[in-house]
């Protein structure tokens, strides 16, 4: 086993958070090596690489790059496309963090003989009875615990999280006070890195260029081999009885719970309740019709079974920065997690993630099946 020394491998994106993380780790006495992953380069821009290299040079730390574009394409982008094409609503950032980014950091650190791994995530870590847990960040507006439900102890015990105890405002001030003005004023990244604005435009572009995705996800497992036409055909909006309401642009361009952007005008508010890929139909209904009191999860991870299973005071979140609900979680005979909600939730969509908390500790999560 590697010695738990003061060496740390830090994921550096070139942005404010990971840059300030590097400064804070250095000031805490760590020997920092920065690694910048090449996951996806929007519009072929490599400015982030130069920013990370320049910062590392100013700080006097070693910096390397790691080309992960091919694995990112197969495990994240093709999964993302696959999920929309089967009528689901994926959350690619949870997959990237749990099954790609943090495991890659761990792998590279092992190869370099480094024990600790770190990022600029706004989360904290605590140890309770020899078990490590992710817990809420000091900055509730930036808290990113929701995305890390799949991490296991081999990763958790190595994590350093230098941004968890400060706010984003404090992070910007921290950089400015040390003469890193460019770092201090960098804009926050928004949305999914490979389609930060509109996923529909990305899907259209992708399907034209890559109309037969070969899905290859390590975890969670998905079925592969579907062949889709580069043309997504228009289909029918229907009510819960199956009666025609209007035409839509193609089922992948809608998500459960959606109200805006339907392109129709009715005398009542309607929401997407269900997506039927095999019929190219999108079912519309009232908001109340979208309420559910239970759900099933696959590909789940539990940090501590005794703390999570069977308790009535578990908090579940199914969206980043969205409402919380109390629930009771059990494991079914066919190895799904059954989540019994204490109050109804609306717009629970297959493919989304759910994360569980108790006493501020992230206890695990999974992917919603239904």
From Swiss-Prot:
A Gene Ontology BP annotation from the UniProt entry: tRNA wobble position uridine thiolation
SUPFAM superfamilies, per database record: Adenine nucleotide alpha hydrolases-like
Keywords carried by this UniProt record: ATP-binding, Cytoplasm, Disulfide bond, Nucleotide-binding, RNA-binding, Transferase, tRNA processing, tRNA-binding
EC number, UniProt record: 2.8.1.13
A single GO cellular-component term on record: cytoplasm
Pfam families noted in UniProt: tRNA_Me_trans, tRNA_Me_trans_C, tRNA_Me_trans_M
Protein localization: Cytoplasm
Name listed for the protein in its UniProt record: tRNA-specific 2-thiouridylase MnmA 2
Species of provenance: Bacteroides thetaiotaomicron (strain ATCC 29148 / DSM 2079 / JCM 5827 / CCUG 10774 / NCTC 10582 / VPI-5482 / E50)
